[in-house]
Amino acid sequence: MLEGIVQIGRALLENKSLIDNLIKELPTTDKKGNPYHVLKLKFSEENLELDVSEEMDSDTVKKYLYIGTADGPNSPQWYASNHKITYFLSETLFNLTNIDFGEPLNQKLKHIFEKFYIDLGSDIKSKYRYALDLSYLDPNVNVRKLYEEYSEQNKGDNKEFLKVLEKEFEKILIKNYGTKLSEFGLFVIYIDGEPLSKYEEYKQKVLKYKSSSKKRKTSSKKENRKDLRCNICGSTENLTDDLKKMKIKYYTNDKITFASELDKNKFYKNMVICQNCLNAILAAETYLDNKLKTKLGDLDLYIFPHFIYGEPLDKSELDLVVDKIINSYNIVKNLKSVKEFEEKIFGITDENRYFLVNFMFFKKSQQATKIRRFIKDVPLFIFNKIAGASKNAREIVEKAIQMNYETYIDLQKIYYLIPVKINAREVTEYKYILDFYENLLTFKPIEKETLIGKFIEAAKVIYLQKNGYNIKKDSLEFYILNSNMLVKFLEKMGNLKGGNTLDTSKLNVKEDIKNYISTMGYDEQQSAMFLLGVLIGEIGNSQYKKYNSDKKPILNKLNFNGIDKSKIIKLANEVFAKLEQEKIRKYHEKTYADMKRLLDENLENWKLNKNENLFYILSGYSYATIKTIMKGETENE
């Protein structure tokens, strides 16, 4: 894992300094394309002014040395540029006065803090104790009075007072400048007409803070420092086992059960790293956020190369490779057509280098990045393989339903076919979906029974309109059709094996139904359930016309927890009665007869489980319903 990241970092540091490589990108426009602005808090000896005139561009983050926030959830925030105003209204200036920048900068910062900030009380944590005196921007605003009124109603909760400050600050912006906080993408501190981030003393402190780690000390006389080597490059110089500067949590080093010999002083045996490799990792982590971060549904992930040979010499070569990887990934993530893929797919290999692709699913929490799943050494041809399998699966479904079907299986579509529990767009149950992606990308087998169980879980979400899932609750029949397409896709990818297909020449059903069964490769038991589902679909179509409503009472006969073998005969008899009741039995007698024959011949040796029974019943229901929908659309054209 770390080897690929260090390779990236080394290329980045070849032509640029570490501090330049720590600069984070920010959006320069809002969702409507309007440019964000820079809000400058301009402190001088006697005055505080706001400047809102500068528009952001791609160089703004470099100009103001934007490197994000200080490491750790409770770390003092002292950086002079930030994407939110909050810290500048409270703790930043106080924290700056606690850093030794040398004179005259120390004196300037102390003067600004003492003049322009109010002490709200010694009993308050330093993080929330101080507040910018907004009367310098609007004489009608009394911050101390605001705090007194707030604290009377919210005793002990000083953190929330920051929201009150923000609201008052925004009122000043609206009143004096006609702008809102949402119109700014970056906030910066100026001192005597210059951005604090341009002061050389400030830059040096940032660099020292970001890169310095505690040097490894021997824990006993027996331990020979010369025996320690960097786990990445083998160096014996400038070693550390302090990994706190890394944003991504590669190793657990805060729980005693993960320490060597269960000794808290022996975490160093898990991971020791030299300063050069640490710098490379820090540079690469910023690059991951800037260039290699993407989403798959509600899942966050990084995609990055691991060079087997031919490492990039510098950032320009690295950018070239990375752009090709990300562009190829984005196409198979949202595959609109295979033709598009064939036109846009990039040749991402050459004779001078060979690399594999790593997928790192992660979650950011409290400024730490925890790895949820690391899928390593994925071959480059995976993108072509996915596009080809998607094309084949779509062709199979189109042949099966004998209609044009403008849907492809891609990485994003898969996410919305497999039920995942979510809360406020945060994935809370992710093991199966990550297992699935790992097996898909590494060509490992996927268990069909478990997958069909997930399809049934999703069908239940749709039918019962359950909340808290990633599944779109619109169309059960199209969901089931797409699930069948996913099965064919996985067969083409090699993750699933196909079974023995029923000889449809022995069936008396309509030719279009025979065609569907043979094209989808259903066996006898699957076909029996499919035909039962077709009959349920036809009853549903009749009920839809009769009641002129989306509600189809026949679906109440289905148990969405699964249908076991003992309930199949009962369901078949109920379907027969409903065909009579709807007065459509004469149109579907052959279908019922074939279903009953296949059922009777296989019942003693029935192999399908309750979820598989329901899935193939729903597949038949889906087919009958979609054929009617498509026919209606064609007639209306």
Descriptions of predicted regions:
Residues 1-185, 198, 240, 284, ...:
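Extended alpha-helical scaffolding segments
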Residues 198-219, 252-260:
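Short Cys/His-rich Zn2+-coordinating modules
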Residues 207-208, 227-232:
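Active-site-proximal segments of catalytic enzyme domains
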Residues 224-228, 236, 271:
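Residues immediately within or flanking Cys/His clusters that coordinate Zn2+
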Residues 230-234, 274-277:
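Short cysteine-rich clusters marking metal-coordination/redox-active sites
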Residues 237-239, 279-282:
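Short functional micro-motifs and their immediate structural scaffolds
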Residues 245-256, 289-300:
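Short cysteine/histidine-rich metal-coordination sites, predominantly Zn2+-binding motifs
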Residues 260-279:
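Short beta-strand-alpha-helix junction that forms the catalytic/metal-binding core
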